[in-house]
C-alpha cells in the first residue's frame, strides 16, 4: 500500500518538481552552449560545464531521491545510505568546481601573458577529473563506516529484531552529524568558501590596480582586457555568493543539531534550507544569461535555431572585446 502523503508533503513535492524542471533544462542549455560556441571553450567555461553537470544531477537525481526520503519509505539501512550519499558527492563537486573557477580567474589577472601556456585544456581536464574523484571520496565516506549504523543496530537488536536494520529512510537517521559538521562542513565546505572569498578579493584588487593606472595611447588593450575580466569576475563572484547563501543555512542547522541536541528546529526552517540548496542548482543558468554576454548570445541562438525554427547566422566565435561580457 503506498504511503499516505499529506497536503504539506504534496506542496513540498510540488516545489521540488518545479525546481527540477528549471534546473535540468537550464543547465543542459549551459552545457549545450559551451558545445556549440567555440568562444566558450577556455578553462573557465570547462569548469562551468563541470558545475552544470553537477546541477543537472541535482535536478535529475537528488531531487527525486529527496522526494522519496520525504515520503519516508521503509528500507534497509545501507539502501537508505546509498540514497543519501549522492547529494554529498554533488555538493562537493560544485564547491571544487567553484574553487577551480576562482583559481582560474586569479591566474588570468596575475599572469595574463603566460596564462594560456599555464592553463591548458589538458590541465583543465585533469583538474576537473581530480575534483570529481575527490568529491566521490568525500561523498562516499559514510558508505565506508562513518555513519549511524551502530546506533541504529543497537535499537534494532533491543527490539528483538535480527538481520540488517530496516528503517524509515531519513537523511539524519543514516548520516552522522559528526561527519556532516566536523568533516564535511569544517574541512570540505567552509575552508574552500573562505579561500574563494580571499581569491576573489585579490582578483578585484589586481584588476582595480591595473585599471587605475594612467591610460596612455598604447594601453587601450590592457584596459579593455582588465575591464572584461572585472565584469566576468563580478558574475562568477555572484555565483559563489549565491552558493554560500544557499548552502550555509543547512550547514548551520546541522551544527545546531550536533552541538545542541535539545534545541528545537522549526520544520519550516529545515524545509526552507532544503529548498535553498536544491534551488541553487537552478540559479546559475539565470545568472549566466543575464550577466555573461557570450552565454546570452548562445542561448538565444539555440532557442531560435531549435525551438523557434528561425535559424540565424552562425555564432561569432570571436566576440569583440568591448562586448564580450556586459
Curated annotation (Swiss-Prot):
GO biological process terms, semicolon-separated: adenylate cyclase-inhibiting G protein-coupled receptor signaling pathway; cognition; detection of temperature stimulus involved in sensory perception of pain; excitatory postsynaptic potential; fatty acid homeostasis; G protein-coupled purinergic nucleotide receptor signaling pathway; inhibition of non-skeletal tissue mineralization; leukocyte migration
GO molecular function, one term: heat shock protein binding
Sites of S-palmitoyl cysteine lipidation: 309
Disulphide connectivity of cysteines: 80-169
Main location group: membrane
Cell location: Cell membrane
Family: Belongs to the G-protein coupled receptor 1 family.
The protein's name: Adenosine receptor A1
Organism of provenance: Mus musculus (Mouse)
Lineage summary: Eukaryota, Metazoa, Chordata, Craniata, Vertebrata
Amino acid at each position: 500500500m503506498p504511503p499516505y502523503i499529506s497536503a504539506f508533503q504534496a506542496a513540498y513535492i510540488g516545489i521540488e518538481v518545479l525546481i527540477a524542471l528549471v534546473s535540468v533544462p537550464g543547465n543542459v542549455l549551459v552545457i549545450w552552449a559551451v558545445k556549440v560556441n567555440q568562444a566558450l571553450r577556455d578553462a573557465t567555461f570547462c569548469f562551468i560545464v563541470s558545475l552544470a553537470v553537477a546541477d543537472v544531477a541535482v535536478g535529475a537525481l537528488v531531487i527525486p531521491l529527496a522526494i522519496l526520503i520525504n515520503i519516508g519509505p521503509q528500507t534497509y539501512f545501507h539502501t537508505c545510505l546509498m540514497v543519501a550519499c549522492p547529494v554529498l558527492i554533488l555538493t562537493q563537486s560544485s564547491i571544487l568546481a567553484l574553487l577551480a573557477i576562482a583559481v582560474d580567474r586569479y591566474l588570468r589577472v596575475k599572469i595574463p601573458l603566460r596564462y594560456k601556456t599555464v592553463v591548458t585544456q589538458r590541465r583543465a581536464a585533469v583538474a576537473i577529473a581530480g575534483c570529481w574523484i575527490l568529491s566521490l571520496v568525500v561523498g562516499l565516506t559514510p558508505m565506508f563506516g562513518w555513519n549511524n549504523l551502530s546506533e541504529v543496530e543497537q535499537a534494532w537488536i533491543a527490539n528483538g529484531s535480527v538481520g540488517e536494520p530496516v528503517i524509515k529512510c531519513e537523511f539524519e537517521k543514516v548520516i552522522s552529524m559528526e561527519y556532516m559538521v566536523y568533516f564535511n562542513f569544517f574541512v570540505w565546505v567552509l575552508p574552500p568558501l573562505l579561500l574563494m572569498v580571499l581569491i576573489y578579493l585579490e582578483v578585484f584588487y589586481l584588476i582595480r590596480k591595473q585599471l587605475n593606472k594612467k591610460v596612455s595611447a598604447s594601453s587601450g588593450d590592457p584596459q579593455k582586457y582588465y575591464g572584461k575580466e572585472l565584469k566576468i569576475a563580478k558574475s562568477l563572484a555572484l555565483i559563489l555568493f549565491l552558493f554560500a547563501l544557499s548552502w550555509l543555512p543547512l550547514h548551520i542547522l546541522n551544527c545546531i543539531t550536533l552541538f545542541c541536541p535539545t534545541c528545537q528546529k522549526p520544520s519550516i526552517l529545515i524545509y526552507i534550507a532544503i529548498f535553498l540548496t536544491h534551488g541553487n542548482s537552478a540559479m546559475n543558468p539565470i545568472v549566466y544569461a543575464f550577466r555573461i554576454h557570450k552565454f546570452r548570445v548562445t542561448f538565444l541562438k539555440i532557442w531560435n535555431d531549435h525551438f523557434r525554427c528561425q535559424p540565424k547566422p552562425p555564432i561569432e566565435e570571436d566576440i569583440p572585446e568591448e562586448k564580450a561580457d556586459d
